[in-house]
Amino acid sequence: LLIQHLKPGVIDLRLVLEGYKPRQLKITVIQGQTAEASVTLEKSQGVVFGQAWENGIQMHFAPLGKDLMISIWETRVSDYALFVKESGHIAPRPAFFAQTPDHPVVNVSRDDAVAFCDWLTTRERKAERIAQSHAYRLPTDLEWSLMAGLEEEEGISPGWRDAHKQKVYPWGTDWPDGEKVGNFADMSADGIPGVLSDRTIAGYDDGFPYTAPVGSFLPNNLGLFDLSGNVQEWVEDEYLKFGIHALGVLRGGGWNTYQTENLYTGSRNAVPPTYQDSIYGFRVVLAKVPPKSE
């Protein structure tokens, strides 16, 4: 590291490198001379963008490009329970079906999901697992599409993208024929409370009538699980750029989804961001925060 144009005197330096613990250093600069220093940095458990990583609460992340890390799972019951315990945030109402800690949390609004991200950012910065220039948040609508392998037009609303969605699923173009590709309203859900018999996928059995443990089905090529089914996932955007009433966006379908058009990768569910439901959950991303312009 070469630093030029320093004024003579004692200089305090803070060395920061992804994947290593920060190090404080003092050097003395003398007019007309070169000051040299040798420093050994200690490896940390902090994030290195571009590499698979596990954070401080055992959430696993996979890279998407150079500046974004994606949680490979939907946020779990255990993750959210820790958030409630440490922050005092109001706990979601219990699901009307049994869930274990490794199931996706449900009955959370977009506002709840944002609060979780803010808490996790503060927690991980304090533990020096992420830098002050990193933050957890919900994925944008466009980022979610990229996560699921779908390239869509930038600069337009999720509502426009929804109206012009392609007839493709995260696993391909064919409707599942016996192969377990996700947790939907299947034969195991036929007739259970909350699912009508005529609102299931005939001939398909994923083995889970309600939510499934995260990661129960095969991941996509990025190593991400459950991008179709299990729970619908909140994203950051509003459904329309203009409108009197704000509508949030949910992606991916859920355990009660049975209609083909609602399982297309480009399908969106537009609901008020304060709504909570037993099919609503979320996953988080870790992003580099752009520097503020002067």
Where are these regions (language model features)?
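Short, solvent-exposed S/T- and G/P-enriched segments that are highly enriched in secreted/extracellular
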Residues: 1-7, 25-26
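Functional-site microenvironments in short loops/helix caps that host divalent-cation chemistry
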Residues: 99, 110-268, 278
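Short proline/glycine-enriched turn/loop segments at secondary-structure junctions
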Residues: 28, 269-276
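Short, structured beta-strand segments at or near domain termini in extracellular proteins/domains
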Residues: 278-292
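Extracellular and select intracellular beta-sandwich modules with Ser/Thr-enriched
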Residues: 22-24, 35
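Short beta-strand edge segments in extracellular beta-sheet folds
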Residues: 27-32, 40-42
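Residues marking the start of alpha-helices
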Residues: 2, 71, 101-104, 135, ...
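A short glycine-rich, aromatic-capped structural motif
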Residues: 7-8, 12, 17-18, 36, ...
